Amino acid sequence: MGSPEGRFHFAIDRGGTFTDVFAQCPGGHVRVLKLLSEDPANYADAPTEGIRRILEQEAGMLLPRDQPLDSSHIASIRMGTTVATNALLERKGERVALLVTRGFRDLLHIGTQARGDLFDLAVPMPEVLYEEVLEVDERVVLHRGEAGTGTPVKGRTGDLLEVQQPVDLGALRGKLEGLLSRGIRSLAVVLMHSYTWAQHEQQVGVLARELGFTHVSLSSEAMPMVRIVPRGHTACADAYLTPAIQRYVQGFCRGFQGQLKDVQVLFMRSDGGLAPMDTFSGSSAVLSGPAGGVVGYSATTYQQEGGQPVIGFDMGGTSTDVSRYAGEFEHVFEASTAGVTLQAPQLDINTVAAGGGSRLFFRSGLFVVGPESAGAHPGPACYRKGGPVTVTDANLVLGRLLPASFPCIFGPGENQPLSPEASRKALEAVATEVNSFLTNGPCPASPLSLEEVAMGFVRVANEAMCRPIRALTQARGHDPSAHVLACFGGAGGQHACAIARALGMDTVHIHRHSGLLSALGLALADVVHEAQEPCSLLYAPETFVQLDQRLSRLEEQCVDALQAQGFPRSQISTESFLHLRYQGTDCALMVSAHQHPATARSPRAGDFGAAFVERYMREFGFVIPERPVVVDDVRVRGTGRSGLRLEDAPKAQTGPPRVDKMTQCYFEGGYQETPVYLLAELGYGHKLHGPCLIIDSNSTILVEPGCQAEVTKTGDICISVGAEVPGTVGPQLDPIQLSIFSHRFMSIAEQMGRILQRTAISTNIKERLDFSCALFGPDGGLVSNAPHIPVHLGAMQETVQFQIQHLGADLHPGDVLLSNHPSAGGSHLPDLTVITPVFWPGQTRPVFYVASRGHHADIGGITPGSMPPHSTMLQQEGAVFLSFKLVQGGVFQEEAVTEALRAPGKVPNCSGTRNLHDNLSDLRAQVAANQKGIQLVGELIGQYGLDVVQAYMGHIQANAELAVRDMLRAFGTSRQARGLPLEVSSEDHMDDGSPIRLRVQISLSQGSAVFDFSGTGPEVFGNLNAPRAVTLSALIYCLRCLVGRDIPLNQGCLAPVRVVIPRGSILDPSPEAAVVGGNVLTSQRVVDVILGAFGACAASQGCMNNVTLGNAHMGYYETVAGGAGAGPSWHGRSGVHSHMTNTRITDPEILESRYPVILRRFELRRGSGGRGRFRGGDGVTRELLFREEALLSVLTERRAFRPYGLHGGEPGARGLNLLIRKNGRTVNLGGKTSVTVYPGDVFCLHTPGGGGYGDPEDPAPPPGSPPQALAFPEHGSVYEYRRAQEAV
C-alpha cells in the first residue's frame, strides 16, 4: 500500500522484557532501538517512548515526555505485542461471565478431561477465564428423522437441525441484569451447535448489548467451527482479552496529538497478518509478538537462500521459538496457550522451555536445563540481583558473551555491567555437586573444571532445542539437514552453529537485524483479512458448484474489507482453502489449491482433492482412495500487499575486516584466542574464520571453530557450518554425555512413534495415538519409551524379557516378534507388541531391541472392540499371541498372522477379528517404526561405537535407579526422624470384596524397598485380573510421582525395588484368566494402595468409568473423568482423569453428530469430593439420551467402596450408574452390566469423587496468589502432539 513520502514508518515489537523499534525514516535510512518494556520510573509506555526517542534524534530537538507527540510526520505504526499473552499467563484480563446451554455449566472446566502433567499428583491446571456462569434455557440438536420431532431447519453447514427449545429471553434478562449489578461487563456466549445454528447466540447477543454489556463474544463469530469445547475457550479468551487490548490501544493512541486518526495503525495477528487496530481482538493476538519473527525470516532468509526451506530459531530469555517456512506459512487451527485451547489460525510456532534464562541443575548424576527460568527478575546470576545460574551464565563463563558489549543496566540500581564473577560463583556451587558425584558416586571419575561444567550445560541445552526441530521436520516427512537455520533473538547467535551441526545443516543465516527481527518482520508484513464458515459437504463433483459459490462469497468479503482499508484491487490477492478429511476419520488438513490449477473434475477454485492427496501422502505415507472426502470448513485469506521495501544494504568491503579486540573463548579442548568483530564495521564480501565473535548492539554471534562466516550483499551473516571434529567418548560415565544420550535415546523413541503414527491406518493409532515405542538394552531392560502412557511403562520390558528367555538362541536377523499374552508381559489383548531384535556385525546375540505397542480396535472375541464387560476367560477377549514370528527371515508372515487373528471365531459365541485390513496395516506400520528405531540407533553406534552406546544404555538406567534410591532414602529418613517405623502398609478392596494388600519395607542403607502384595485376593471369575506387567507399570508410575521431578523412565526405576506378588492372585493370575478389566480398573486400585502406603495423597476416583454403546450400525467407547484425591498442600482437582488413564473425551458436538445420542448434562457432581482440610475433587454427572435401540455396557468400580481419605479426610462419594427408562422407571445398573436401551431412555453416570486430606475441622489454608497458568507456556504442534499422546 502506498504511503506519503517524507514520513516515518515504525514497526515495534513489544515483548515481555524488551521493546524493539525499527523505523524507516524520511529518505529511506533505518534507525533501530531497544528499550525495556517496563520502566515506569522513566516512561509510561515503551512503544510511545521508542517513537519519541527516534523522532527526537531525527529532529535534533527535545520532545517532552509529558506531552502528546505530533503524529503529522508519521505515516504508519505497526505493532506486535505480548499484552494478550501476558494477560493469559498472569490471569489479568477482563471480568467475564460465560453463558452456556443448560446442562453444560462446567464444560470448559472439564475440557478434554485430560490432565496436563501425567506425574504431578496435585494436577495443576490453569483456572477457567470466566468468573460466573449462566445456563441458558435453549437446545438445538441434529435431525435424525425420528417420528414426531417436528419440521427440521437447515443450518449454515447444510445439516438439518431440530430446535428442541427456543431461547427463553425473558428468563435470561433478569440473570443478565444481575451480572451487570455485580460489575461484569464482558460476556462469552457458547451454545450447543451454534457453529451451524447461530441464531440463538445472536438473539442472546442482541439482548446483552441492549442491556449495556460493553463486550459480547459469540462463539459462532469468534470461530465458527464444530467442537464446542475449543470454540468455547476461544470465545472466553476473546471476551477476556479484547477489552484489555482495546484499553491498551486507546491508551497508546492518547500519547499522540489527534490520537493517530490520520495514521495507519496496524497490529500483528497470530496468523502472521496485520489487522487494523479497531479489528484486533484477543483470540487472534496471543502470538502477536513471535509471529513477526516468522514473517521476518520468511521475507529475508528464504528469499536470499534461493527458496531453500528454513527453520526459524528464535532463542530468547525464557524460551525458544522454533518454526518452519518453505514458501508458505504453516498454520495450526487449534493450539493451547497458557492452558487455554484456542480455535483460530495461528502460525505453527513451537515454544520450548530452553532459553538464555533457563536454570541449570545437577540431579542424580544428570545435567538438567530448565524448564524453570530465572525470568526478567531477578534474571540470571550475572544480572547482579541474586538470581540463579542459567544458560546465559554458562555462556558468560565460557567467554562467549562480553560484558562490555552490554549496556550498564544491571544490579539493584540498574546501572552496572554484567557480572562474570557472579556467574562463576553461582556455577561453582553446581560444579561442586557435579564433582562430589564424580568422585564419590557409583563410577568414580576425575572432577571437571568450571569451564567443562559450563560447556556441558550448553551442550545439553543445545540437544534439548534440537528435539523439537527434529519433530517439526521429520514428523512431516522433511529432512532437517535440507534446511537453512535462520537464527534470531537475543540469545540464538551463541548456539546457532552447534544446533546446525547437530541437525546436519550446512548453513546458518543471521540477519543483520537479528536481535530485532520480529520488529523487522512487522515492517515487511502484509495486511490480512480472513473469512471462514463451517461446511458438511462431500468433496464430489455434485458439490463443486456449491463450494465455488461459498468460496466466491468469502472472497468477496475479504476483498471488500481490504478495499475499505484503502487498498486498490490491484494490491489485493486471495487464497482459497478447504478443510478436508477422509470420511470416518478425524484427521483434517487445511489445504490450498494454489499449486493445483482447476481441472474438469475439480471446483473452479482449484484441484483441492489433488492437493489433499499429495499432502496426506507426504505426512502419513499412504492414502485411502476408497473413502469419500468430507469438507469441514471453507476459508479464504485475503492479503493487501503493504510491506516496506528496505534498501539500506552495506557498502562492499574495501579491505580486510578489522579486529576490534582479542578475547579468550572456551571450546572443546580448552581456551582459544578468539578475535572480536563489530558487525557495523563489516562490509559485503568479508569472510571470517571461526572461532570468532561478531558483536552488535542487540546480539552476539559465535562462529565456532571449523565454521566460516561471510557478509552477504544485504549485510547479513551467512555461516557455512563445517563438520564437527568428534571428540573421544569412552564407555565410562560422563554426566555431560549422559544428559546428551538421554535426549538422543528419547528422540529415537519419539521418532519411532512419528513413523508409526504416519504409516498406521486405524483411528486408534493414527488419531487417538494409543501406542508406545521403546528402546531396550541387550538384556531387554527398558532404556527409553515415548510417550509415557502409564499402563505401558513397566509392561513392555516384561514382554521383551519374556521373549529373550522363551526363544533363547532361536532369534535370527530378519526376525520380528509379535506378542500380547498377559503371561508374556501383555497388558490386555488389544495391545499388540511388535519386537525387533537388532544384530550387529561381529556379535552373535542381539545388541539391543526396539518395540512398538499399539492398541488395535478389534482382534476378535465375544464383543466388538475386544473389551467385553463379562469375559471369564482369556480366549473370549480376542486373538492371543504368546511368541509369534510376525516376520521371519525378512518375510512378513501374512497368511499365518491372518489365521491367528481369525482363530477366536472357533471359540463358542466369539468372532475372529472384525477388521483384518486395519490389523495387518497397523502391524506393518509397527514393523516400519521398529525399522526406524534400528536405523537411528545404528547411526548412534556409528558415531560413538557399540561399546559406548551399550554402556550409556546402562548408565541411563543407573541414573533412574539413583533417583528412586534417593527418594526412598529421603522417605525413610523422614519417618525415622519422626520416630515412625520403616515399614508402611495399605489395603483397599475391589467392589467384589477382593482385597489388595501391600506392605513396603524400606532399607535406609541401600535406598531400596520390598513391595510385598502377599494377602491380596485370588484371581476372580471375571475380567478384573491384572497381569503382573500391569502391576509393575502402576508401580513405576507411582515411583515417578513420588520422585517428584523429571527422571528417565526406564528399567532402572525398578532396580531398587523387589516386588512380591502371589502367583494365582488377582495381580498375577493364571494364563487362562480374563484380564481386560484389570488393565482399566484394577490398575487404578493398585495405584491407590501404593500411594496410600506412602501417605502421598488421598484416593482418586479409582475408576476409568468405561462406557460402551453399540448396535449393528455403530460402536462407541469412552472413559469418563472423576475426582482426584487431595494431598498435603492441595485440593483435589474436579472432573479430571487420574493416574493410569488420561484419555480425552469426545467433544459433545462430535458425539451428537456421529452417534444416536443427545448429551443432556455434563457437569461437576458437586459435593462428591471428600471433606478435609484439603477437599477431594468432585466427580462428574453425564447424561446420555438414546435415539436408537442399542446395547449399553458399563465396566466401572468404586460403586461399593468409597475412595479413601487420609489423615482425617473423609472419603469421596461412590459412583452410581442409573438407567431412566422412557416411562420414568429408574434402575440402578450396578458397576458392571450390559443392557439394551431404547429411544427415549437416559443413562445417568455419576462418577466417584476424590478423598479428602486432613481433618475437615482444621483451619482452612490461607488463600494463595491468584490462580495462574502453568509455569511455562509451551506451545505449537509439537507440544500439542505430545499432549495428545499423553491423553490416551
Curated annotation (Swiss-Prot):
Cross-referenced Pfam families: Hydant_A_C (PF19278), Hydant_A_N (PF05378), Hydantoinase_A (PF01968), Hydantoinase_B (PF02538)
Domain of life: Eukaryota
Modified residues (Phosphoserine): S1265
InterPro entries cross-referenced by the UniProt entry: ACX-like_C (IPR049517), Hydant_A_N (IPR008040), Hydantoinase_A (IPR002821), Hydantoinase_B (IPR003692), Oxoprolinase-like (IPR045079)
Main location: cytoplasm
The protein's assembly and partners: Homodimer.
Protein name in UniProt: 5-oxoprolinase
Organism: Homo sapiens (Human)
